[in-house]
Each structure stands twice: as C-alpha cells, then as structure tokens.
Curated annotation (Swiss-Prot):
Family annotation (Pfam families): Semialdhyde_dh, Semialdhyde_dhC_1
Annotated catalysed reactions: N-acetyl-L-glutamate 5-semialdehyde + phosphate + NADP(+) = N-acetyl-L-glutamyl 5-phosphate + NADPH + H(+)
EC class of the enzyme, as a word: oxidoreductase
Pathway(s) this gene product operates in, as recorded in its UniProt entry: Amino-acid biosynthesis; L-arginine biosynthesis; N(2)-acetyl-L-ornithine from L-glutamate: step 3/4
Entry EC number(s): 1.2.1.38
The name this protein goes by in its record: N-acetyl-gamma-glutamyl-phosphate reductase
Task of the protein: Catalyzes the NADPH-dependent reduction of N-acetyl-5-glutamyl phosphate to yield N-acetyl-L-glutamate 5-semialdehyde.
Subcellular locations according to the entry: Cytoplasm
GO cellular component, one term: cytoplasm
Protein family membership: Belongs to the NAGSA dehydrogenase family. Type 1 subfamily.
Length: 345
C-alpha cells in the first residue's frame, strides 16, 4: 500500500483528494494536516467522509510526513517549496496542487505569484503533471507540479492542432468559465451566495497567472512561439469548467481530417473523450469525475476552428489529475481509483 499524506486538507481540493483516495485500492491515508483544526476528526468537518476516513487533522510537526511514500500539497502557493526539500531528502515523493513547481521560468513565477522561489534548483527535476502530454516524465519524477485548472483545458484543447502545425500559434484565444469552487474555500465577499449567485463576470482579462503557465508548456511541447489571449470568467455554479478556444487554420483541412487529428491524439487516453464533430459538451457531463470532453466546430466552414472543452475543475482540473500522476509515479494503472461515473443531475 502507498502511504499518503495530505498537507492542507481543509480546502476543496483537499477534501476532493480525500474523497478519491478513501476508495483507492492501493492507498493507505496516514496523515492530513491543518494547524487550525489540529485534533479535529476529518469526518466532523466533512460528514460526507463518515465511515470512510477515520483520521483526525494534525499539525504539520506532529504528522510524521517523512514516513509517507508520497505527500500531496493542497495548500496556498509557497507552502510546498518550503517543505519539499526535507521530504525529498527522506525519500518521499511530492505532488503540489499549487503553482510552486509548474513554471520553469522563475522570473515568471515571481512576477505572477509575488514571492521569490525558495528552491529553484528543484525546478529542473520537477515534472509538469499533465499526464496526457507528459506521461514519461511523470513516471520517473520525485516531484510533480500539478497543472492549473484552466491550463489543463487550454493545453488539451490546443495541443493536437499545434503539434500538427495547422493553426496560427501566434494568435490563440481562450474564453473560459469556471464554477466558484475554483476560487477556493476561503471566506471572500465576492464568493458569497448573494454576490456570485445570479451573476456572471470576467476577471483577470488584462493578465492572469494561468496564461504564462499555458504558454510555457505549449512552447515546450511544440517548439513554437505561442501567443495567447486568455479571458477567464466566474459563473454561478459550484463546480465545472467550460473553455472555448479559437484558432485560425493555416493549412487546408476538411472537418473529417480535423476530427481524426483529435481522435488519433487521444485514442488511448482513458480520461479524454473526443465527442463527434459539432457536439456541445456540458459541464454536468463531467461532474465529480476525472473525465475531460472535447468537441470541435468550424463556423461557416471558414478558417476558424473552435474547440470546446469541459471538465470538473476540482477533479481533472485538480485532485483527480494529481491522483492520476501518483498512480504513474508508483507504477499503477493510471485509472486506479479514478473510474468514477459523472454525477447527474
């Protein structure tokens, strides 16, 4: 059994990790930390886990994280990089759901996250945790930077076209919408029901930290310079993400060839569903699952291709993806513990 610790288990990604790992057949949950909730049974905070998780929260100094096989960080940015060196020295693998190990460019990290990087030497060995595009590196990694939720949809939606060199990489547009759980569990006025309900707004249009992450990874993947206009939006639902990407075709391709490009790219991917051309995927079709669904459109048979991508921002966009990485790191089938059917209605 894989001994698992979770640092920061009181947020939405933390409880989502607990939900998934509680039924994972190869995992033994051994520690979950929270300074504020030290001693509180996990099931008291999250009654949904009664009978599944019998751990109590413990402060980090009591948690014996160095005795784990892997530690997940479901924490604010900056926490994992402070603790990772000690864990790695003890032979513990690290998966960070924040941004500490996503960007290779430390200057970009410091610009967008407003803090110095405390262990830049670890970035060279950190694997970016988007399994479908970086599987081999993740298998061999000691430390993984789990992708952001928006970058997951943007990269999987654009990668086949960029790798085939059939679109203008210098002018990509991503219009993305997320449920409010993407903002985390902290108390914040803009996330109150009376503020977020019955409302729809854009944010971060002049610059968002997920943009440099997406651009860096697409450039590493393709060797092309990438230009991206990214506009995120907050929608009045709890979980779910819908991303619409626009790109200009630079090569003559019919719709069947475009569809085949995506079907071939993801034919062996258990968590990527390429829907029939012209489909309209819905966020609810992925709720509480690790599935991501893609559909292509070509308005008026012109030179613009529209890529629609949906996922659950807390699962494939965060905790499910992290468990998918863990499975690879420990030589398990990557679907282990992740074959949940989406919840409807």
């Amino acid at each position: 059994m894989i001994k698992v610790g979770i640092v920061g288990g009181t947020g939405y990604t933390g409880v989502e990790l607990l939900r998934i790992l509680a039924t994972h057949p190869e995992v033994e949950l051994t520690a979950i930390t929270s300074r504020k909730e030290d001693g509180l049974p996990v099931s008291d905070m999250f009654p949904s886990l009664r009978g599944r998780v019998d751990l109590a929260f413990s402060s980090p100094d009591k948690a014996k994280l160095t005795e784990c096989d892997v530690v997940f960080f479901a924490t604010p940015h900056g926490v994992a990089m402070a603790q990772a060196p000690e864990l790695l020295a003890a032979g513990v693998k690290v998966i960070d759901l924040a941004a500490d190990f996503r960007l290779q460019d430390t200057a970009a990290f410091e610009k967008w996250y407003k803090m110095p990087h405390s262990c830049p030497e670890l970035l060279k060995e950190a694997a970016y945790g988007l399994v479908e595009l970086n599987r081999d590196a993740i298998r061999k990694a000691r430390i993984v930077g789990n992708p952001g939720c928006y970058p997951t949809t943007m990269q999987l939606g654009l990668a086949p076209l960029l790798k085939a060199d059939v679109i203008d990489a210098s002018h990509l547009i991503a219009d993305c919408k997320s449920g409010v759980s993407g903002a985390g569990r902290k108390a914040e006025v803009s996330m109150l029901f009376a503020e977020a309900g019955d409302n729809f707004k854009a944010y971060g249009v002049s610059g968002h930290r997920h943009s440099p992450e997406t651009v860096e990874r697409l450039q590493i993947l393709t060797g092309q310079k990438v230009g991206l206009l990214f506009a995120p939006h907050l929608v009045p639902m709890i979980r779910g993400m819908h991303s619409t990407m626009y790109a200009r075709l630079t090569k003559e391709m019919d719709n069947a060839a475009l569809q085949a490009l995506f079907e071939n790219a993801y034919a062996s991917e258990p968590f990527v569903d390429v829907m029939p051309f012209g489909s309209h995927p819905e966020t609810r079709s992925t709720r509480a699952s690790n599935m991501l669904r893609i559909a292509l459109h070509r308005p008026n048979d012109g030179d613009t291709i529209v890529i629609l991508v949906v996922q659950d921002n807390l699962v494939k966009g965060a905790s499910g993806q992290a468990v998918q990485c863990m499975n690879l790191m420990f030589g398990l089938p990557e679907t282990t513990g992740l074959l949940h059917v989406p919840v409807l209605p």
